[in-house]
Structure formats: C-alpha cells, structure tokens
Amino acid sequence: MGILGLSKLIADLAPQAIRESEIKNFFGRKVAIDASMCLYQFLIAVRSEGAQLATVNGDPTSHLMGMFYRTIRLLDNGIKPVYVFDGKPPDLKSGELAKRAERREEAEKALKAATEAGDDAEIEKFNRRLVRVTKEHAREAKELLKLMGVPYVEAPCEAEAQCAALVKAGKVYATATEDMDALTFGSTKLLRYLTYSEARKMPVKEFSYEKLLDGLGVNNREFIDLCILLGCDYCESIKGIGPKRAIELINNYRDIETILDNLDTSKYTVPENWNYKIARELFIEPEVANADAIELKWTEPDEEGLVKFLCGDRQFNEDRVRSGAKKLLKSKQSQTQVRLDSFFKTLPSTPSATNAAKRKAEEAKKSANNKKAKTSGGGGGGRGRRPK
C-alpha cells in the first residue's frame, strides 16, 4: 500500500522535492530496486516483448520476460541495478495482509460475475487484482539475475527498508519502487517509474528526501508521524484526517502524542489500541541486513546458462536471448571503461587556476618557439623564424 496520499501532498506543498528525468540521466548510478514491485508489474503487463507468457505447462513467464528485458534496458542506459527481495513481513503488518486477503476474495467473486456476464474490461481488471508474487516467482527471478551477472539482496524483512539502508550507507544512489514508504524508511532518493516500459513513455520521477522535509517543514521523526497519520501498512489511521489536516496537525503539534492530547475526539475517531508507537519504531529501526557488510558485484553473463534457463520449456526465443546476453556483456565492458575513465578525471578548475594554467602553457609555448628559432637557421648569419 505504501503511504496514502503522500505523493500528492509532496507535489502540492514541496514541488521542489520532485524532479522529472529521462532514464539516460541516471547513467553511472547504482540503484536498489524493489524486486517484488517489479515482478508484480511484469506479471500484470498486457504486452510481452516477443517472448511467450507461459510455459508448455501453463506456468507464467511474464515475470522472467520483464526482468530480463527491463534489466537489459537499465544496463544499456548505464544504470547498475541491484534487486532487493522481501523477507518475512513484520507481525504488525498482519492486519494489512488480512485486508488484502479479503479484497482478494471480493475480486474473485467479482471476476466470476464478470466472466458470466462476458464483460472483457471487468474480467481484465479483476484478473489484475488477483495477481500476486509467489515464492516461486521470486526464486526464478533470483536464478535469472544470477545468470545475468546482476546482484540481488534478500532482505530479512521489508525490501523498501533494505533499499533505504543501502542508500543511506552509500552503496547505491537511490531506491526504485512505486511504494512511497521508502522515503519513510529514510531513503534519501526515491525513483518512481524507473522500471516502466518504454512504450508507456513515463518520465522517471525523482524524490529528494532532504527537499521534501524542508518543503513540508518537518524533521525526519515528524515526517514518520505524518506518514502514520496519512495511513501506512502497519496500523490504522485516524478516521476523518486527510492529508491536508494531517500536515496541519504535525506542523502545529510536532508529534502524534501531542496531537492526541489536543484532538477533538467528537470529530475524529482514534483507533482502539492504536499501535502507532510500534509502527513508528518499525520505520525508525527496521529489521535490515547490515548494508556495510553487503558486497555488490556485477559480473559477466552466462550466455549458455541463460539459453538453458529461458528457452526450452519456457519457450523464449533463443536468438533473442543470445542477443540479450551480448548486450549484457557489452554493457558490462562499457561500464568498466567508464570506471577507468572516471578514475583519471580531474577536479573542475577554478577561474584563477585556469588562467594560471593558460599563462603557463603560453610561456612554455613561447620558450619552445624561441628555442626553435635559435636552432633552425643555417650556418653563420642565418635568421630564425619569428615565433607565432
């Protein structure tokens, strides 16, 4: 679910925190990607990119197709992705998971009715709602990434929290996900729409954590309380409080405890046994693997391994898989060259340093020409050429 209404609130009150960019502008960046979010996008995608969407046994392959071709696209644009997979959800998320199960049951009933009515649009809509990422989807995706030479991380708990930890540790530049709670976990940069297909023509939206805090007039602790008021996965929110009222309350009272002390309970209903304090702690101290101990390595692809894994029962086109493997190898080699070039890059010159360098070059040139003039003439009284 993420954080309800946060994206619009930032756009309204802190627009300077959002920047739209083309994918090519992230050349050379390492990015931690929410793998489950990607797999979900790929599973509901209507169009394939030339591969079959199911095996001979009817098992879906759109998640593998999407992972393969979108990852190649990222690498083609000079981006170094690392995929982060969800672990066990925190106990506090059980309420949200129960609600999702209820919505799934409702979608199944609605799908049955739409099928009986022959309503294709409704059938497609409810089929999408029934899509979920399984452990088998994740296992296959990890195997594919390993063959592609792309690193992945298995989070002990929430993938967004682990992504944020990698960003804060300086291992990667940003978190790429559609869930805004990556910001609540403290990711200094959030990228939305990075893994969307080129056909959708969606610019990448980059959110700056520092700028949004400044624009909203809050610190990181107050921002977490704001997100809890807006509505998160870990606890209920106060009924009747929307985004505008939530930011007003945070700006006036600075934390949920003081808000509750001053809240008109005849107007707003506070959830019984509200676990906002535990939710707050989950955002402040999430269960994550030590980011400093995680080593990220991008290696050369295993072309034959990819062909064996994707072709055959999974029915991917072998020529396209081999072509993709060659693109992976090419991007790996070009990224190595970029790193070598950047190693020798000099610092930007200041105006005074630039002028001094010019003077030194001119003096050296003049000295060389003078020396040449003295030695270039014939014997005796020959004259040298005038320095240019």
UniProtKB/Swiss-Prot annotation:
Residues 336-344 are annotated as: Interaction with PCNA. CDD domains: PIN_FEN1 (cd09867). Residues 122-253 are annotated as: I-domain. Residues 1-104 are annotated as: N-domain. Signal peptide: none annotated. It is found in: Nucleus, Nucleolus; Nucleus, Nucleoplasm; Mitochondrion. Its EC number is 3.1.-.-. Mg(2+) 1 binds at D34, D86, E158, E160. Disulfide bonds: none annotated. Residues 343-388 are annotated as: Disordered. Mg(2+) 2 binds at D179, D181, D233. Keywords: DNA damage, DNA repair, DNA replication, Endonuclease, Exonuclease, Hydrolase, Magnesium, Metal-binding, Mitochondrion, Nuclease, Nucleus, Phosphoprotein. DNA binds at R47, R70, E158, G231, D233. InterPro entries: 5-3_exonuclease_C_sf, Flap_endonuc, HhH2, PIN-like_dom_sf, XPG-I_dom, XPG/Rad2, XPG_CS, XPG_DNA_repair_N. Belongs to the XPG/RAD2 endonuclease family. FEN1 subfamily. Interacts with PCNA. Three molecules of FEN1 bind to one PCNA trimer with each molecule binding to one PCNA monomer. PCNA stimulates the nuclease activity without altering cleavage specificity. This is Flap endonuclease 1. It comes from Drosophila ananassae (Fruit fly).
